[in-house]
Amino acid sequence: MATSKDKIRNYNANITAVGMYLPEKVLDNHYFEKIVDTNDEWIVSRTGIRERRKEENGATSDMAARAADDLIKNHNINPEEIDVIIVATVTPDMFFPATACLVQEKIGAKNAWGFDLSAACSGFLFALKTGAGLIEGGTYKKVLVIGADKMSTIINYKDRNTCLLFGDAASAVLLEPTEDLNIGVKDSILHCDGSGKESLYMKGGGSLNPPTHETVDQGLHTLYQDGKTVFKEAVKGMADISVEIMQKNNLSSDDVAYLVPHQANLRIIDATANRMGIPKEKAMVNIDKYGNTTAATIPLCLTEYYRDGKLKKGDNLVLAAFGAGFTWGSIYLTWGID
């Protein structure tokens, strides 16, 4: 089976700009002590999370547009030059039109077309690979990839197994072509396995269980997670796929500047880094501040580490994620922004 690395291409898709949006409202662990049976020490020891954000001033498209605007303003991008908008999300404003269409209008990208991509916590990786393919084909010059989720809208705040974990946020990257094949997106390995569907899902609201008074009363419109199964599969999936992409590209632990993992649980992140043979210090972490923001976690890490001066041009990165579906994957790229 051919993979992205097997193809001969003239361009790499390079991340040339980043942006982010974080809601103002902060929910710390003490907030949850008041509504469920838990405490700060337990949450930190089990998840690594201390705080998360909750959006009170808009929908997913608003957060996505604010992240895009942050990118546009900080990197002096003309929104009318954006060709394509891809929004990775599991919390769209509505089933249709696509969140990308709403973002297109809000940021003034009048010449862009776009679509949404649903792959849960792996969504940004899947969207990044899709956007890179559009760039590598030579047809498009600017592809905006956004990870955005308003998880607070599908959380049962009485369910200790899930309400502690998730936060709201959005983050964006801009992909552009480069003839310098030493930088940009270099390889990807992506997977899905539908046999894991009932371990992490929202049962109600779609065509299988359309909304009724009964589905609402039964709590089918909020997220369900089999925590033990997801933890076990996520550790294996993220660790195995990260090692696989390193071996495929002859990367040693010294060659990798950072592991950029989906921020689901600090123990999963540590286990993945350990399996890759890299020190924990080389794993990007912000789960303590924002929790699991689903499709936004990886671009949030990239944006923060770049703006803090920790990411340098030429740094080799291994991105890894695992999410509902099950979906999982890894992308190898070399950072290309000075």
Could you tell me what each predicted segment is?
Residues E136-A170:
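Flexible, glycine-rich active-site loops centered on histidine and acidic residues
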Residues N39, T60-H75, T99, E233-K248, ...:
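Short, well-ordered amphipathic alpha-helical segments that serve as non-catalytic structural scaffolds
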Residues L300-A320, F326-D338:
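Catalytic phosphate/nucleotide-handling subdomain of diverse soluble enzymes
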Residues E41, N78-V84, N111-W113, K141-V143, ...:
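Short acidic capping loops at alpha-helix termini that bridge into adjacent secondary structure
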Residues W42-R46, R50-D62, V90-V143, N274-L302:
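Conserved catalytic cysteine-centered active-site region
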Residues I15-A17, N57-F115, L125, K248-T272:
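Conserved beta-ketoacyl condensing-enzyme motif
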Residues A2-N57, D159-K232, K236, D240, ...:
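Condensing-enzyme catalytic core mediating Claisen C-C bond formation in acyl metabolism
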Residues Y21, A88-D93, A119-S122, G147-S152, ...:
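Acidic, glycine-rich active-site loops and adjacent beta-strand->loop/helix elements
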